[in-house]
């Protein structure tokens, strides 16, 4: 978690209940980040190393690969609808069909200097039948979906990647921080009923809004 005021590294493992057991946490003062954006590579690398070293010492586990949270003023979101025409409508819709549709959305052209971070399906439509949450197993030739798309500046994402790599680590998944926070603190019932998660940080405040178990808005 590369924040404006502090950098936090956490080591955890899944237990038999599919919950994360925290094995070690490291923290350091963040000196090279402003409003969620890296503005000093050298200072950020130093802060990352301090947090990682502390997390390794407490967990007694060597850290090589990390998942990174991303936020900041360069992040924006938008709504988009798209569809595919299935090649085999006599077969039921499967994960490959959904992946094909999502991959198609990832190819959308954003503004210069931007790239897509997340493509999040909200609901589906099969041959005109709308408001479908789970289309897998259904028959249909035209598969449509509404998407919530999260976009960030390429330069900001690359700067984070450089800091991670220069700290001797490999960067895995990048996740929008309010989405990661929502998975950690919100229940399915809360997301289904409707809830707004507000993450107040040292330099930015992030929001994620859910309704009917679907991500509706991020900011």
Residue ranges, per PLM feature:
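A structural feature that tracks compact, well-ordered secondary-structure segments
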Residues: 206-208
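Nucleotide/phosphate-binding catalytic cleft detector across ATP-hydrolyzing
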Residues: 2-6, 10-198, 214-218
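A cytosolic small-molecule/anion-sensing beta-strand core signal
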Residues: 211
């Amino acid at each position: 978690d590369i924040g404006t005021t502090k950098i936090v590294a956490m080591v955890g493992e899944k237990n038999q209940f599919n919950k994360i057991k925290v094995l070690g946490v490291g923290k350091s003062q963040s000196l090279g980040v402003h409003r969620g954006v890296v503005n000093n590579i050298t200072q950020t690398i130093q802060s990352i190393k301090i947090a990682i070293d502390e997390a390794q010492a407490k967990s007694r586990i060597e850290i090589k690969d990390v998942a990174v949270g991303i936020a900041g003023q360069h992040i924006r979101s938008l709504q988009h609808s798209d569809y595919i025409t299935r090649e085999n409508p006599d077969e039921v819709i499967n994960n490959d069909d959904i992946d094909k549709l999502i991959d198609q959305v990832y190819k959308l052209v954003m503004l210069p200097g931007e790239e897509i971070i997340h493509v999040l399906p909200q609901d589906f439509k099969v041959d005109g039948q709308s408001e479908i949450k789970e289309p897998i197993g259904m028959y249909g030739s035209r598969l449509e979906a509404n998407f919530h798309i999260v976009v960030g500046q390429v330069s900001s994402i690359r700067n984070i990647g450089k800091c991670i790599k220069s700290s001797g680590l490999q960067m895995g998944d990048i996740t929008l921080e309010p989405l990661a926070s929502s998975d950690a603190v919100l229940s399915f019932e809360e997301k289904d009923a409707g809830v707004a998660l507000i993450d107040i940080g040292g330099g930015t405040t992030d929001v994620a809004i859910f309704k009917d178990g679907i991500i509706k808005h991020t900011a």
